[in-house]
């Protein structure tokens, strides 16, 4: 059967490290995340932005012939407020927020912390990619038109952070070394990456080499074994 999975970026994320004038005596920067709709065998929304973006999400769903009740899974790549703000719209969906999988008061046990992927359906898999936070996840989508698309959340801030790693490091990382592992793993399996705060981009061989070259030999073994594990389960 042909793969019907389709990836639509309904909002392209952005971020700035420029500190603006104080508001209510607090300095601030501006950011919002990429929000992605996956349609096909399952309907999935990934990273639901802030609570002030409700209308944008509802209009985007309507433009794709969907309502919140048509969504099977709502996924937040991690628990920060710009990635979870409209999860409450999707009360008929299973929710995955970082390593936590839940419906109402049911919390499903899955060993993301052991490096094991969670398969939603054929060609749709959630993998653990910690680093930005302790329990980041990425969504791996196999498509006919784009190959393998990885929705990576803030493991990648934007394409430019491959050549300028100070970009992602300055945006916060609980474990930079672990985040480097995750970035290399994602690049190894992706044809396209949707970063947390920038446009979708195509992964080149040069990018893969760049992301791997600073890893120690021990981390290369880890990255290879983890990538092989994903291949074995069909990621």
Model-derived features with residue positions:
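Active-site-proximal loop/helix segment associated with metal-binding centers of metalloenzymes
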Residues: 18-20, 29-32, 97-119, 158-170, ...
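Zn-dependent metallo-beta-lactamase
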Residues: 1-41, 187-189, 205-210, 223-235
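Beta-strand-turn-beta hairpins that frame and shape the catalytic cleft
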Residues: 2-7, 39-43, 117-125, 143-148
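Active-site HxH/HxHxD metal-binding segment of metal-dependent hydrolases
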Residues: 30-32, 49-119, 158
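Active-site neighborhood of phospho(di)ester-bond hydrolases with catalytic His/Asp-centered motifs
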Residues: 46-49, 72-80, 96-99, 127-131, ...
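Metallo-beta-lactamase
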Residues: 59, 88-133, 135-233, ...
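A short catalytic or substrate-binding loop motif that flags glycine-/basic-rich loops and adjacent residues
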Residues: 28-31, 130-134
